[in-house]
């Protein structure tokens, strides 16, 4: 990873081997109900990020959010966290803080909406729900997701736009998860 502009954030993360292990753990064990992040799209972008081909703060923020959730679900004394002195919860919050900083930097540079941004906000809401510490922040993310999803037309049938099938499916999943989040926050679950 050779992104000069985020060296300070990358310095807060473990080795690439641990990062990849946590991301792999997330996709294998942590998203069987809530598939907020499209695995094939993210994996492709993550490989480009690691190679230095594309420096993207949304990708870094998403990687850190997946690591935070994976840390939450890891069994005690799992080999991926052997080098850490902190609790699983503290490690997860450290990864989430890096995700937050990366997202803030992205938003300071660009206000453009994308499916990658929607997926990042969804996975961040998932972590906030698991951590049970930032109830007000979940309301904020929920409102932002409804606004972004509607602005992007995620609520409309993508079949009418003659999109590639994979893109249409990804858009449907994103909208479905926005609605699930909206309903769960609305009903206080």
Residue ranges: model-predicted function:
Residues 132-146:
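Classical protein tyrosine phosphatase
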Residues 69, 120-123, 141-142, 174-177:
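Extended, hydrophobic/aromatic-rich amphipathic alpha-helical segments that build helical scaffolds
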Residues 35, 49, 142, 178-179:
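Enriched - but not universal
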Residues 15, 19, 137-141, 177:
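Hydrophobic (often cysteine-bearing) scaffold residues that line and stabilize catalytic clefts
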């Amino acid at each position: 990873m050779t992104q000069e502009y985020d060296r300070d954030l990358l310095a807060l993360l473990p080795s690439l081997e641990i990062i990849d292990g946590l991301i792999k753990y997330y996709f294998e064990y942590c998203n069987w109900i809530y598939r907020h992040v499209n695995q094939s799209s993210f994996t492709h972008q993550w490989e480009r990020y690691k190679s230095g081909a594309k420096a993207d703060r949304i990708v870094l923020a998403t990687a850190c959010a997946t690591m935070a959730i994976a840390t939450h679900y890891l069994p005690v004394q799992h080999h991926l966290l052997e080098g850490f002195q902190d609790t699983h919860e503290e490690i997860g919050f450290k990864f989430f803080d890096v995700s937050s900083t990366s997202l803030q930097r992205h938003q300071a540079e660009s206000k453009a909406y994308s499916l990658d941004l929607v997926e990042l906000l969804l996975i961040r809401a998932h972590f906030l729900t698991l951590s049970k510490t930032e109830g007000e922040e979940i309301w904020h993310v929920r409102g932002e997701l409804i606004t972004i999803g509607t602005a992007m037309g995620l609520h409309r049938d993508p079949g009418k736009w003659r999109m590639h099938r994979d893109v249409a499916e990804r858009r449907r999943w994103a909208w479905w998860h926005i609605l699930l989040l909206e309903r769960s926050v609305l009903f206080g679950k």
